[in-house]
Amino acid sequence: MRAERVVDGDTFVTSSGSIVRLIGINAPERGRPFYLESKNALKALIEGRLVELDADVQDRDDYGRLLSYAYVGGEMVNARMIEDGFANVFTLPPNLRFAELFLSLERDAIKNGKGLWASSAVTGVKIAGQHFDAREYDEENLNDEYLIISNENDFAFDLTRFLLRDQAGHEFVLSLILPANGEVMVRTGSGVNDNSNYYLGCDDPVWNNDYETAYLWDDEGKLVDLFIFDRGNQHPNP
């Protein structure tokens, strides 16, 4: 079949009318930094061309879209989008056949500052740790699900309009100031912000307890830091 029309950097429509969601990757949504670059990259790879689709454990998502690895001329499009920095890895069990490959490609793209991973001029601001698996039930203890953002500078740092995102694409525009040589716990639930705690105001858990990546972008859409969590193995920015 042919790829008839690209929707965004991780979704396209086939000549038969099927909507295909590429497995293992996530691209910026409309209106977000790098949306057009990502969409155009996928268009250049597949639009109007013959594609071969290959499923994993699940063949459709909750929206009825086909979940697939897409191949054009023998090349896997999912992997190419990650390799070139036009999408981030989206690890979602049980569709994990190429998870390790995708993570390796993403690490290389980050090291080389490709696409999404162009480095910010911001220094000294880090995602320093996480507690994604709250005590008892996550849904009943949202404020025990948190990550830590630290400031290694000798001055307070304004993160207003910085973007915090998980690998699934949940986005939070921040409005907080990091204290000099301090840190802030960014908690999922609601509360009163202070010098040590910042609340996202969510009604449901955000961070995946098994596989997750937290990304922090500056107000120009440049990557400040990321934090990878994989079944208890924590990896700062590679």
PLM regions with names:
Residues 1-238:
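Small beta-barrel nucleic-acid-binding modules, primarily SNase/OB-fold domains
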